[in-house]
Amino acid sequence: MSDQSMSVTLLAIESSCDETAAAVIQDGNILCNIVASQRIHEKYGGIVPELASRAHQQHIIPVVAQALLEANIQKSDLNAVACTSGPGLLGALLVGVSFSKAFASALHIPVIKVNHMKAHILAHFIGDVKPSFPFICMTVSGGHTQLVIVRNYLEMEVVGETQDDAVGEAFDKTAKLMGLPYPGGPLIDSYAKQGNPLAFPFPTVDMPGYNYSFSGIKTAFMYFLKKNTAVDPDFIQKNLPDICASVQHALIDVLMRKLKRLVVDTGINRVAIAGGVSANSGLRKAMEQKREQEGWDVYIPAFEYCTDNAAMIAVAGYHQYLENDFAGWDLSPEPRLRIGGGL
């Protein structure tokens, strides 16, 4: 293990999807967290990989420069560079990985490859309130829906995951069916606050064990809209809050049922959520209800750490640095990188 009595300063880079981000961490404390988001994808109704990688190329140097400036850190102060190696979009990851390798090589310091999904989980170690090990984390995003047992900073086991759509993808697809712009998930959440979650029931599929399925809800929702708009073309407009509240309720119900099953089966009542969908107010409320009704120790990330950011990459990279977990110079992007163990 590295000598922790010495100051350890890392630059972290995140470029897995449509945010170009950089952060600086020193002795476990985040000094800055810079994120450049890409608005160009909205008119296409989803992420366009080629446009994403081009935008990363435009943003990465100014974002890193801004991070070093805000942290008041010189390049010579850095001990290593941590970067997201996967999962994510190949072209987007390539920009961050290539920059990180070149930057680290020029400074004669090591590069650390970070698993993006592990980093989402470790975002819980940024603030003052941190979970104790072991704990359960439900990772919920546009690309992933997983139940993970977190044993320490480096050891995690996936015990359940979606067998089709990720929950964030289900939110965006149902929003698109209603004619809402991309990204639709936050819009559903916003409209749902004024609606009745029990107005329109949707069938859900109970997969074996801790696995998830959301495609059934999406299909049922499509036929629900088709049937009702055939009778009244203005059905969606007239009932938008109730429709949004109902579909959100169905999706969250699926998430929480499996999460509760895992808590009961393992006896681990320290429970966290992570990933973009952890910003959803309905999910956050459901977690708070479990805290109040069933005594769970609940950990909900600050909004700025729900979506992709480099601070979480910095935390993961810092703990890997302490264990001398460095990558070779042959490091390449791993678009389908998984959390180890389990499934």
Swiss-Prot record:
GO BP term (any one): tRNA threonylcarbamoyladenosine modification
Q: What is its main location?
A: cytoplasm
Keywords, comma-separated and alphabetical: Acyltransferase, Cytoplasm, Iron, Metal-binding, Transferase, tRNA processing
Under CDD domains, the record lists:
ASKHA_NBD_TsaD_bac
State the InterPro entries in the record. Answer: ATPase_NBD, Gcp-like_dom, KAE1/TsaD, Peptidase_M22_CS, TsaD
Annotated residues for binding of Fe cation: H116, H120, D308
> Record's Pfam families?
TsaD
Where is this protein localized, as stated in its record? Cytoplasm
The cross-references to HAMAP family, in alphabetical order and at most eight, read:
TsaD
> Record's family?
Belongs to the KAE1 / TsaD family.
Write down what this protein is called: tRNA N6-adenosine threonylcarbamoyltransferase
By which gene is this protein encoded?
Answer: tsaD
